[in-house]
């Protein structure tokens, strides 16, 4: 099991194939992604690597994190994320990862925060059918109807599907195909849509339900080794 990557969603575009057909893709940018820390079985009870994305201004970083970055001699980072890895896929702190970590044709899982839609009704939020257009129904056409039955149980249970805040949730899209990789510009192009809006940070990892691509570099594709 390899580490994943942290990337920024730049937006969507399309790629043209040799036969003239086009493929919609989401462009992800891997910006100065470095290994910040390593979790070990002996010390932490599990094996993982902590990655840091982009460079942050020192004034925007808390004092504990400043010391954390200084200890491994890396610039302060905007975003930190951990990825569980196998014992033989551990990377040294300070190593810089490349978008070439993934290869064309490989399947990946992408995790991010979905776009916030604000307060939404039951029809939009949960795909409810709503009430009838006529036959005695007035004003309540888009309502969700009864929520508590009658005297028994006489209450609305927790987690009942009702109107409320839609979006702004952690969402993972599975088995997206890598359509193109630009190692020089550190760009990753994934077929289809990815959760979140423009400039949202996303986590990209090998698809958990598919075997790892035979040509994918193991344990990782590095721009520069530690130190």
Curated annotation (Swiss-Prot):
Coiled coil regions, renumbered to chain: none
Pfam families the UniProt entry points to: Ribosomal_L3 (PF00297)
The UniProt record lists the keyword Cell cycle: no
Entry superkingdom: Bacteria
Keywords: Methylation, Ribonucleoprotein, Ribosomal protein, RNA-binding, rRNA-binding
Gene Ontology cellular-component annotations: cytosolic large ribosomal subunit
Post-translation changes: Methylated by PrmB.
Record keyword Nucleotidyltransferase present: no
Residue numbers bearing the N5-methylglutamine modification: 151
InterPro entries: Ribosomal_uL3, Ribosomal_uL3_bac/org-type, Ribosomal_uL3_CS, Transl_B-barrel_sf
GO terms assigned for molecular function: rRNA binding; structural constituent of ribosome
Function: One of the primary rRNA binding proteins, it binds directly near the 3'-end of the 23S rRNA, where it nucleates assembly of the 50S subunit.
Subunit details: Part of the 50S ribosomal subunit. Forms a cluster with proteins L14 and L19.
Similarity comment: Belongs to the universal ribosomal protein uL3 family.
HAMAP family registered for this protein in UniProt: Ribosomal_uL3_B (MF_01325_B)
PANTHER family: 50S RIBOSOMAL PROTEIN L3, LARGE RIBOSOMAL SUBUNIT PROTEIN UL3C
Protein name: Large ribosomal subunit protein uL3
Biological source species: Gluconacetobacter diazotrophicus (strain ATCC 49037 / DSM 5601 / CCUG 37298 / CIP 103539 / LMG 7603 / PAl5)
Gene: rplC
């Amino acid at each position: 099991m390899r580490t994943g990557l942290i990337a920024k969603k730049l937006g969507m575009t399309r790629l043209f194939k040799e036969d003239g057909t086009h493929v919609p893709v989401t462009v992800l940018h891997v910006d100065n992604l470095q290994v910040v820390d390593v979790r070990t079985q002996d010390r932490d009870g599990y094996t993982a690597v902590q990655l840091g994305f982009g460079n942050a201004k020192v004034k925007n970083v808390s004092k504990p994190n400043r010391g954390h970055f200084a200890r491994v001699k890396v610039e302060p980072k905007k975003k930190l994320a951990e990825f569980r890895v196998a014992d033989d896929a551990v990377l040294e702190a300070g190593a810089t990862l490349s978008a070439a970590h993934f290869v064309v044709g490989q399947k990946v899982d992408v995790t991010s925060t979905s776009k916030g839609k604000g307060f939404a009704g039951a029809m939009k939020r949960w795909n409810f059918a709503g009430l009838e257009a006529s036959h005695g129904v007035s004003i309540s056409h888009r309502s969700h109807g009864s929520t508590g039955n009658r005297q028994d149980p006489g209450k609305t249970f927790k987690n009942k599907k009702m109107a409320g805040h839609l979006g702004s949730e952690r969402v993972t899209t599975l088995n997206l195909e890598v359509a193109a990789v630009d190692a020089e510009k550190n760009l990753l192009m994934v077929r289809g849509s990815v959760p979140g809006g423009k400039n949202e940070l996303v986590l990209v990892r090998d698809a958990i339900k598919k075997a790892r691509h035979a040509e994918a570099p193991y344990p990782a594709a590095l721009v520069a080794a530690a130190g």
